[in-house]
Amino acid sequence: MSNPMRPVRSILLAIFTGCAGLIGYALYLQLVENLLPCPLCVVQRMAYWLIGLTALAGFFHTPETTGRRIYAGLMAVFAFTGGLVALRQAWLVRYPEAFECGISPEEAFLNALPLARWWPVMFEANGDCADVTWKFASLTLPDWSAIFFMILAALSIYVLLVRENQRE
């Protein structure tokens, strides 16, 4: 008899690993490539952290149906929120004239949070949201982030809707 939670646990572990990899790459871009995170980047980092930690909690907890749905629902909300922020940043990259220069209220707010003081390398916003310094396959960093958030949202919805009696 196979464990019906095994596919779900594998997906949760994959979600956690993916989020950890994305956060690691963001730190690489910041610390090695000197690409400073903007306020919207920091919010996306927070969303990746929340998704990843929720997936990790679900992986270790291995809850029944209701608990699994709560974890998956939270991950989906975090993924959709992060995706909206990434799409907003992608819009700002394409229409930089809509962006005001100087310290934004978002930057001041984020930098005043305890997270920014506790771990400034990860959560302090110092960059310009409309600055395009990185592209891959003609897509900017916010474009790729939006794609990854969509993938994470889809996986979260799958975990939310999968039936327990499904076989491997």
From Swiss-Prot:
SUPFAM superfamilies: DsbB-like. Keywords: Cell inner membrane, Cell membrane, Chaperone, Disulfide bond, Electron transport, Membrane, Oxidoreductase, Redox-active center, Transmembrane, Transmembrane helix, Transport. It is found in: Cell inner membrane. Residues 29-46, 88-143 are periplasmic. GO terms for molecular function: electron transfer activity; protein-disulfide reductase activity. Residues 1-11, 64-69, 163-168 are cytoplasmic. One of its GO terms (biological process) is protein folding. It comes from the Bacteria. InterPro entries: DiS_bond_form_DsbB/BdbC, Disulphide_bond_form_DsbB, DsbB, DsbB-like_sf. The keyword Lyase does not apply. Disulfide bonds join C38-C41, C101-C129. The chain crosses the membrane at residues 12-28, 47-63, 70-87, 144-162. Its main location: membrane. It is a multi-pass membrane protein. GO terms for cellular component: plasma membrane. Required for disulfide bond formation in some periplasmic proteins. Acts by oxidizing the DsbA protein. Belongs to the DsbB family. This is Disulfide bond formation protein B. It comes from Nitrosospira multiformis (strain ATCC 25196 / NCIMB 11849 / C 71).
